Amino acid sequence: VKLVGKSTLRLTVYPAIKDIGFAPGAHYFLYIPDRWCFWESHPFTAASWRPAGPNLTQAPEKVIVALRKTTPNSPQTSSDEEDIKKIRSNEKRKSYRRDTIIITTSTQRKPQRAKLTFLINARRGMTRSLLERITPGSSIEVPCLLEGPYGIARPVPSFPTVVIIAGGVGVSTALPYLMQHLSTRVEITKRFVLIWSVREGSMAEKILKGVKGLGFRQDVVVKVYITRSEEKDSWRLPIGVKVRYRRPRIEESIIKEAKGRVPGTPMAVIACGGAAVVDCARKGTVEALEDAAGKNGSGEIVYWEEGYGW
């Protein structure tokens, strides 16, 4: 368990079984048996999943700068052993050219363990007790029992335009869909928009740095709205992420994306966060539908809601 915000925890679970049936949007019930109320459980949406498998890495083992003679009477090629001997004998570099020899080896490390990651907003009970046991910059290990998965994976990849509105730890629902899209080369989705409102920029930095591929896809737009920023220069977000220092105008954003899509194509809107976030997203979706009602072949808008009340 690590602290990623003033009251936000990142809980990493290493399941004993390799396949736990993870899918974007899945949630699990977590039990912490080292507490007095060990029978208590809380549902949390998984923010990411890494399957078990081999951990094979290939990296340069040695980098050797070889000096080779360039005189007309000298051979143009030589073996690596000869080059190494020349370097070790400290021969003069005059009339020699430099080549780089890179020797790579594949090393087999310990097998990669399956891993589930959860983002938890500490409030009362179990989550508060975890928060009180952690100090900034440190982590703790606790036993954990996992029950799940529950929930339904939405058919997000089948929509040409996807807009996800997230508030706080509600980004747990958005991240698996975002990672799924970034890891897919051929897809139907031509525009993927994530609008995330979060109190602390440092929290956004810690969470988004684990998302690979941000800033390299023109079809992906990530907008982060910092609502309580004190030290703007103390954190950095990945390249390509747009930052605003205010609350997002959720209704306007949804209507804008609905108008900008290709006419006649469907659009998916997912809201994940507290009551204020989902209320605004629902209202914006209705207004976008009403705005498009008079247009012929405007395309449908599908709305899904993942409320966060814990």
Where are these regions (language model features)?
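FAD-binding FR-type
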Residues: R10-V162, I226-S229, A288-G309
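Classical protein tyrosine phosphatase
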Residues: V171-I195
